[in-house]
Amino acid sequence: MSTPAHRFEPPGFRIEINERELPHEALGVIIGVEITQKLNRANDFRFTVRDAPTEGRYRWIDSDLFSLGNEVRIYLGYSGESLEVVRGRVQGLLPEYTVDGLVFAVEGSDDGYELLMVESEAKVFRRKADSDIVTEVARLAGLSPRVDPTEPLYAARTKPAGTSLFRFIAGMASHNGFEVRLSGRELVFARPAREARADLALEWEREILEFHASVNTRRTVSDVIVRGWDGTAKREIVAHAATGQEWIQEQGRRPASEITRELYGDVVRVMSNRPVASAEEASRVARAELSHASDSFIRGEVEVVGNPWIRCGSCLELLGLGSRFSGKYYVEQVTHRIGPAGFTTLAEVRRNSL
């Protein structure tokens, strides 16, 4: 069994608060760091500090370093090579006073959290495509948009009252077969990386520490039919995404819709009264829904030697798992942890073919 280069290197992390690096004595009392990145959700961070009183006063829990609202940047890596993994603001302090002393956690989320995630008043966007709306929302939140273009141009799109802007654009992402995520100072609204080259290759008993997976046809379908209404022409719009028309994740594999048809015959999902403006848009929605259903086919968790280059939206090639489970997987969620046991990365992954 070969050994990954990083396994015996000490993991490193850096934390900057309000653009100033934490002093060495502050880093020395941080006993754990955890960062979670999620598709269609905000990214979160948490680090844990051990404190002790000096002359009756705690040094760190009372420090302005950890005040609510402070900007935080966390970098992870090895041997001086580190990567910025999250940038956000302190949103919570969680102290625990016990007989063993004081330990407190500092928690927060991405920049733009308040504007994007908080339920807000209704807002109307006029004469814009979905991609234009996301670009506008990103700039409102002080983020840089990284957006794939969409069609058509809508006369009006309304974000309902009581819904967050992030939930609103996540709905548009689903409609277009896109995904939305926060990546540093960027708001990403894009097609998943289908048929992409793997960003990283990871091997069982080398980088891979554990792998758990399930194959499930409970939510897969063979076909999707979308029915809408053209109010101008006064006619029904119908589109059909047939077996095998989901987006390809890996060539040479059998897609979930094909396996579903072989096992159960026609399993057709019909979506009625969808707000589609044309047959072309209805076809995109049908294919997006077929792809979404197939994405539930194989789901897994892979724990690896800590790797900050694993991100949401990455394509991982997992090796050494046998012919059935080796292959390309798409990353939906990543949790990086540094603690007494070292640096590990846990990725939730999916695959739509076997």
Predicted features by range, described:
Residues A141, N176-V180, D230:
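Sec/Tat-exported extracytoplasmic proteins
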